Amino acid sequence: MREVILLRTLTFYEQVRCYALDAGTFYATYNVAPPLLIFIGHSVTAGKTRSQLSRDDKLSLSDVQELVIFLHRVLQNENGWVVTAINAILNGEAGLKREDGGDIFADAFRTLREDRLDGGVIYADILRRIFHAKSATTAAGLHLVNLKSAAGEIGLRAGATDQFFGVINIGDAAHFLKLVEEQSPEIAVEEEQFSGSLFQAINRQDSPINVLLGSKKFIEGWDSWRV
């Protein structure tokens, strides 16, 4: 599972990198907005106690919590696992094969291969472009911030950075954060009283948000040119 999510993140990074080469032309000429990485859970948990949660509700919490743990591990990069995994993917050593025995990602990540970027360079650039972190030291783990003035929203920050890179809209933010504190105490949980809605501003050209985590409610009535 971890490798699959990393592959999605690496694909998103390649899109971000390509967009940044000529963002002005993409937006002004073709109305192409900056890309957004989205992970969707099963359903909404708003207004429900733990005992009232349906199977889908619990799956949604589990999905989003797993993604949060993944982001935390990416930012920590313990024993350099992210760099090692990226190198394995680009070198055709990820262990995922086609029926003919060839590497399933042989034709993927073409620009990264053409530029001969190694895992260390790519990881440092992922921290900068996606997580707004200047270095691995700055990143140093995930911080979840309960946005008290934006109901149901949780901001995502990388370590000591002061800019949000992502947002969770799970319905009942307090309930979700309590689960994280109980089951993943290594992840920092904070709150802010006066931050505005990150989700509502996600389509703005100057939005710092690169990652959106949430539930199926986004499928119904929500749209974005960034997806």
Residue ranges and their predicted role:
Residues 7-18:
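Short, hydrophobic/amphipathic alpha-helical patches that form generic packing surfaces
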Residues 20-212:
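Conserved C-terminal RecA-like helicase domain
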Residues 214-219:
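Structured mid-domain segments that build the active-site/substrate or prosthetic-cofactor binding neighborhood
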Residues 223-227:
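A short beta-strand element within the Helicase C-terminal
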